[in-house]
Amino acid sequence: MLLYIVIIVACIISKLVPNEYWAIHLFFIIMIFMVYMYKKLDIHQKYQFWNYTMSGLSGHNVQVTCKCY
């Protein structure tokens, strides 16, 4: 459901916003979607999410240790 809302909002913004600012708005839409998905995860999945994200961004194997009590 949220994905459809994000797509609809992206289409509306693409029609209203000048072309040179489209990348900035797309970045914020993606960030909002990532935060929403992150909040749905439990504590162990959150650490795995950041391990995968940081590994993808840096190109190196990154391990965030989970101190879950």
Swiss-Prot record:
Q: Which residues are glycosylated?
A: 51
Membrane-crossing ranges are 16-36
Keyword Transmembrane found: yes
Q: Which UniProt keyword terms apply here?
A: Glycoprotein, Host membrane, Membrane, Transmembrane, Transmembrane helix
Q: Which residues lie on this side of the membrane: Extracellular?
A: 37-69
Tell where it localizes: Host membrane
Recorded GO CC terms = host cell membrane; membrane
Glycoprotein: present as a keyword of the record?
Answer: yes
Q: What is its main location?
A: host cell
Q: Tell me which parts of the chain lie in the Cytoplasmic compartment.
A: 1-15
Write down the membrane topology.
Single-pass membrane protein
Would you identify the family this protein belongs to, as annotated?
Answer: Belongs to the asfivirus X69R family.
Its name, as the record gives it, is Uncharacterized membrane protein X69R
